[in-house]
Amino acid sequence: MADSSLVGGGEEPEERVIEAALRPKNLHDFVGQHRVRKQLSLVLEASRMRGRSADHVLLSGPPGLGKTTLSMIIAAEMNAPLRISSGPAIQHAGDLAAILSSLSEGEVLFLDEIHRMSRPAEEMLYMAMEDFRVDIVVGKGAGATAIPLELPPFTLVGATTRAGLLPGPLRDRFGFTGHLEFYSVEELELVLRRSAGLLDLKVNSAGFSEIAGRSRGTPRIANRLLRRVRDWALVHGIEQIDARTASAALDMYEVDKRGLDRLDRSVLEALITKFGGGPVGLSTLAIAVGEEPETVETVAEPYLVREGLLGRTPRGRIAMAPAWTHLGYAVPEGVFGQEALALFEVEDLGVEPVAEWLPNGQ
């Protein structure tokens, strides 16, 4: 069975240690995200010139694109200590109050998955971000008293994969908001070149290209695949990694040319061979591949939808034309994805509906 964490979200403790060692330490070394990097550099430089803490920063985007790394870089660029916590760890206002009250002046507080913080903690954070003050409630009922607690100036860096779940009042309190985009293959090759240098690996250009092409546009995955290829080359006594070596290693781990892993291909295979390309409901599809519906929806579907291999419709999931081609099947007439108009719903096109899922309304 394939290592399901290879292109997924899970990381072993040892992997996290290695990943941390590969992180760039300043904006100059950070590859990609040119727009966000340029804007953030200006914000930090202006803050240093004023001799004040930087504005609060909100970073959004898919996992693995560098939100945590950028928080560390912000602290390093401001020559400030960094405190790391996460939304799920702050379920009560008291949890947040304890963290805020222990911050030193200028410290950077990084809150990962900030959208998962509890509502009482969010409301306390409003005042802390705007006025650098929180009210600590002592006692209960009619005898409860709010004691104001002054906080030193600090910089909050929030990270989220679901910016739409953040309340408007919280989003509005961030002075800078940056959205991280998926990386191009060329940018991932630059990431891999830097990592290979730090790991003292010999990789040629074709090897970098092969790994980058299977990395789903995500640096975290690219670095993970590089380490697995390194292991394969070490065991097989290969000194320089080329395209053939990288391909053989990643084929063994069941990561194909488009970055699809075992689960991704199982979902598409089931859609095509068991349900004729769909539509089929999520629960039924999950049973067909032997996984939980949540796993299919959160692990496999985002990448498959982004690549145009799977479609989500009101009636269920469907295999798009490129999925049939990628798995080596002939594309039946009328399968979505063959024409640009097939990407839109009938209501979007403003035309009369035809018989559902049949070509030319037949």
UniProtKB/Swiss-Prot annotation:
Q: What's the EC number here? A: 3.6.4.-
Q: What is known of its domains?
A: Has 3 domains, the large (RuvB-L) and small ATPase (RuvB-S) domains and the C-terminal head (RuvB-H) domain. The head domain binds DNA, while the ATPase domains jointly bind ATP, ADP or are empty depending on the state of the subunit in the translocation cycle. During a single DNA translocation step the structure of each domain remains the same, but their relative positions change.
| A molecular function (GO) term | ATP hydrolysis activity
Q: Name one GO cellular component term.
A: cytoplasm
Where along the chain is DNA bound?
312, 317
Q: What are the top taxonomic ranks of the organism?
A: Bacteria, Bacillati, Actinomycetota, Actinomycetes, Micrococcales
**Residues that hold Mg(2+) according to the record:** 68
Location relative to the cell: Cytoplasm
Q: Which reaction does it catalyse?
A: ATP + H2O = ADP + phosphate + H(+)
The enzyme's first-digit EC class, named in words, is: hydrolase
Tell me if DNA-binding is a UniProt keyword of this record.
yes
Q: Which UniProt keywords apply?
A: ATP-binding, Cytoplasm, DNA damage, DNA recombination, DNA repair, DNA-binding, Hydrolase, Nucleotide-binding
Report what the protein is called. Answer: Holliday junction branch migration complex subunit RuvB
Biological processes per GO annotation: DNA recombination; DNA repair
**Record-stated family:** Belongs to the RuvB family.
